[in-house]
């Protein structure tokens, strides 16, 4: 036993060292953000991959190199109307400063009179959401493989004082090796201590957000519980037709498990979907280690996952660079750029 404990101890030490170095790297970029690193004319626009309330994501090709990227285009006037200025500035400032194997990379960012542009690595496997809906549910080993990547990603983000706040299968892309790329940092925020903004997706909201309490990084660990449940069951733990009914279920502290869930899985989920913050895993004195050392993760080699050495349970079909068959089709729209600058002041730091 002594040996195993010693190994665990030294692993936890090297994680500490790793995170200290990661924080240095992050802070350099956080304090001195990259700005205006490309121009719209350098990209050939190919196809819309997704749409949102104030913009769209398009597959583009960098004319000079022939590389494909995903370009997020945000309409400045719509961002202002929807009161998302702060969130949008957060997203870009955070994305340009982070670096982790399971976070989508921001390659370029720029703006023009009408829009903000974030050009990211293109992840051709599509959303976990579409694969989960097609397959129905993931086996526990399959769900565990993805969950481990989220645990490591949250450990990294939280060590930088970042809360993610938008975990859901739609925001997890599957890359060519079958690993996860977390995308959409629209709700991510750097916060020491507590924050109060109501944001997120109804099914994934922690009770303390619904109850308008100040909340912290523990909301991400609650959301991890929701995600693991949804991956392993095929449906989320709290669902109803109306958000208000979902919220009632979430704050009730009651959750029911499918009969096929293993007892280890149920135990982990009871500790993540824990309404009492003083008992929720990830938020206790041992932090993330309560999760990493849980029996459900007994077979997980955390370092091998980080190094992407574990064989993925599922590799998305891929027909070559620029293949979009893992994404839905959307109506195409011209990108219109005004001759006058819109909302210059609001987005001067972008």
From Swiss-Prot:
Any one Gene Ontology MF annotation carried by this entry is: protein serine/threonine kinase activity
Q: Which residues does the UniProt record annotate as the domain Protein kinase? A: 43-297
Residue(s) carrying Phosphoserine: 10, 139, 338
Q: Which residues form the AGC-kinase C-terminal domain?
A: 298-350
Q: Which residues carry this modification: Phosphothreonine?
A: 48, 195, 197
Topology in the lipid bilayer = Lipid-anchor
Q: Where does ATP bind?
A: 49-57, 72, 121-127, 168-171
Q: Which reactions does this protein catalyse?
A: L-seryl-[protein] + ATP = O-phospho-L-seryl-[protein] + ADP + H(+); L-threonyl-[protein] + ATP = O-phospho-L-threonyl-[protein] + ADP + H(+)
Tissue pattern of expression reads: Ubiquitously expressed in mammalian tissues.
Q: Which SUPFAM superfamilies match?
A: Protein kinase-like (PK-like)
Keyword Nucleus in annotation: yes
Compartments in which it is found: Cytoplasm; Cell membrane; Membrane; Nucleus
Query: Which SMART domains does the record associate with it?
Result: S_TK_X (SM00133), S_TKc (SM00220)
Modification(s) after translation: Autophosphorylated. Phosphorylation is enhanced by vitamin K(2). Phosphorylated on threonine and serine residues. Phosphorylation on Thr-197 is required for full activity. Phosphorylated at Tyr-330 by activated receptor tyrosine kinases EGFR and PDGFR; this increases catalytic efficiency. When myristoylated, Ser-10 is autophosphorylated probably in conjunction with deamidation of Asn-3.
Main localization, broad class: cytoplasm
Q: What does this protein do?
A: Phosphorylates a large number of substrates in the cytoplasm and the nucleus. Phosphorylates CDC25B, ABL1, NFKB1, CLDN3, PSMC5/RPT6, PJA2, RYR2, RORA, SOX9 and VASP. Regulates the abundance of compartmentalized pools of its regulatory subunits through phosphorylation of PJA2 which binds and ubiquitinates these subunits, leading to their subsequent proteolysis. RORA is activated by phosphorylation. Required for glucose-mediated adipogenic differentiation increase and osteogenic differentiation inhibition from osteoblasts. Involved in chondrogenesis by mediating phosphorylation of SOX9.
The name of this protein is cAMP-dependent protein kinase catalytic subunit alpha
Which species does the entry assign this protein to? Canis lupus familiaris (Dog)
